[in-house]
């Protein structure tokens, strides 16, 4: 079979190259001509998969190595019997650790304690639920908002979005991008929400850029409103508002989910679906794709926020990604070039922590570190 894949997806040849003809290319440049004679298409969020791309093609199977699917016309795929698979939840650990890293950095810079703050989580799917779990495991109070889930399961202590805007010190968004229907998320944070938001709040967006009206956000910041802003996603990507970037406390190029481990989990999910769909025996030794522990530390004092921040920075320094974006954002194609050449970070599980303190063992294990009691 003939496979076309985004060149920035790892392990493509190792997984699919044994009995197939595999071609890789830039995801944003994939055209109808490229897929005309292709059987299998594997993409990321930068490729729009729709009628314009797939009409007159021989594509039978589409996989996207992403949790979001707003770049995929699923109705079209269903209409023409094209099998589709995506990778929900596989980037959850990476995104949660990105958010936690950003919050720890802000807390250290602002000299406040996260345990004194209330975190409002908007969207409590794979990512939001894991973030809630980890924050609570570290003693941080959370408020949850997810109207579609509340409709299905009313037993949780759900809060309205208006309550989060009024009461949460920190708002972090983990929703899909939905334009219509009962629960649209497009411009969920508009000028009215931003003006109602108390000063000195923290806004974090790692889901889709258009969940926050970027022009409205820039307007209130230019008018002097004091907000801390962490943006990994932007409206009109790969272009972004340079003035808005100048106001952001942390700005990164849509890489919150870009860990080595998350990329491997995502493509493995697509590979397994491919094997099932085409009735192919899975001969891959999955252990060959495992990412080994690469850092070792011994901790001899009880974990607090300052020490946790040091451990996190040992694995991933979020300031580095912020500096890189600011350096190249104004250059032609800079946003995509950073993503293309991004040195995928490791997750906290890559850090082997040795400690003789029982409470450290419990806390660090729940936060996702690789812990060994000594």
From Swiss-Prot:
Main subcellular location of this protein, as a coarse class: cytoplasm
Enzyme Commission identifier(s): 1.1.1.290
Catalytic activity: 4-phospho-D-erythronate + NAD(+) = (R)-3-hydroxy-2-oxo-4-phosphooxybutanoate + NADH + H(+)
Binding site for substrate: 45, 66, 258
Localisation: Cytoplasm
Protein's UniProt keywords contain Oxidoreductase: yes
Keywords per UniProt: Cytoplasm, NAD, Oxidoreductase, Pyridoxine biosynthesis
Gene Ontology process terms (BP): 'de novo' pyridoxal 5'-phosphate biosynthetic process; pyridoxine biosynthetic process
Domain of life: Bacteria
HAMAP family assigned: PdxB
Family recorded in the similarity comment: Belongs to the D-isomer specific 2-hydroxyacid dehydrogenase family. PdxB subfamily.
Function according to Swiss-Prot or TrEMBL: Catalyzes the oxidation of erythronate-4-phosphate to 3-hydroxy-2-oxo-4-phosphonooxybutanoate.
Name the record gives this protein: Erythronate-4-phosphate dehydrogenase
Organism classification: Bacteria, Pseudomonadati, Pseudomonadota, Gammaproteobacteria, Enterobacterales
């Amino acid at each position: 079979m003939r496979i076309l894949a985004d060149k920035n997806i790892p392990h493509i040849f190792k997984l699919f190259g044994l009995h197939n003809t595999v071609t890789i290319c830039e995801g944003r440049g994939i055209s109808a001509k490229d897929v005309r004679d292709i059987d299998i298409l594997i993409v990321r969020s930068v490729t729009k998969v729709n009628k314009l791309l797939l009409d007159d093609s021989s594509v039978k199977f589409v996989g996207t190595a992403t949790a979001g699917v707003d770049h995929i016309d699923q109705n079209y795929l269903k209409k023409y019997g094209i099998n589709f698979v995506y990778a929900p939840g596989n980037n959850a650990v990476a995104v949660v650790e990105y958010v936690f890293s950003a919050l720890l950095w802000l807390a250290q810079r602002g000299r406040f304690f996260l345990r004194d703050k209330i975190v409002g989580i908007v969207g409590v799917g794979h990512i939001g639920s894991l973030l809630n779990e980890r924050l609570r495991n570290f003693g941080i109070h959370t408020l949850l908002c997810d109207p579609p889930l509340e409709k299905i399961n009313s037993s949780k202590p759900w809060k309205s979005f208006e309550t989060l805007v009024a009461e949460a010190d920190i708002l972090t968004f983990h929703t899909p991008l939905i334009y219509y229907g009962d629960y649209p998320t497009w411009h969920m944070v508009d000028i009215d929400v931003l003006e109602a938001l108390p000063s000195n709040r923290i806004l974090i967006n790692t889901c889709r850029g258009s969940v926050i009206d970027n022009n409205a956000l820039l307007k209130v910041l230019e008018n002097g409103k004091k907000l801390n802003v962490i943006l990994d996603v932007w409206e009109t990507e790969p272009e972004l508002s340079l003035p808005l970037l100048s106001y952001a406390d942390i700005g990164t190029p849509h890489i919150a989910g870009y860990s080595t481990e998350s990329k491997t989990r995502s493509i493995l999910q697509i590979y397994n679906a491919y094997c099932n769909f085409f009735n192919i025996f899975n001969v891959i030794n999955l252990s060959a794709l495992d990412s080994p522990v690469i850092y070792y530390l011994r901790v001899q004092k009880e974990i607090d926020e300052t020490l946790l921040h040091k451990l996190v920075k040992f694995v991933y320094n979020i300031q580095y990604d912020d500096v890189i974006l600011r350096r190249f954002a104004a250059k032609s194609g800079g946003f995509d070039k950073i993503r293309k050449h991004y040195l995928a970070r490791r997750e906290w599980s890559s850090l082997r922590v040795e400690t003789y303190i029982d409470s450290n063992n419990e806390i660090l294990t729940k936060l996702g570190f690789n812990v060994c009691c000594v």
